[in-house]
């Protein structure tokens, strides 16, 4: 229950090399592919409008580029970060913000390359937690929702209104922040953890 508070700088010492740097490196590769597709496509200018074959070639290149962009956004939406002793959710809050920052950067850079601007899709479901204390688990859920709403508003997007908060569940309907023992299952066997791309905390 926050018995040991970890400040943002220390959290970033884990989140940066485990989440931010690898995902930005992946995006750099995808961005290079997108840039190459767009640069090789026939260009339209005020003096030269594209027609027929050139227009079709440019349309195909832009569709391929957009497909790469959307595939990376899907990667971010499906990315999962787990804190198996999440306390009141400080690591989850920071991880959510960083994943949303990456998505925002990806969408902005894709738009600079000429692709349509994307709306934020990464949400609280990307962070998973396990916490023994019911009170701390509920605080973690609230922290994650506060993080989602604060990020959306701070970056000029409207937060969800109906509902403002929805239950934090994965695709199978399991709580993303689970109130249970992370080490032992109720029958005394080893506890199973949810599938995650990275473990933080």
Model-derived features: positions:
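SAM-dependent methyltransferase catalytic region
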Residues: 3-201
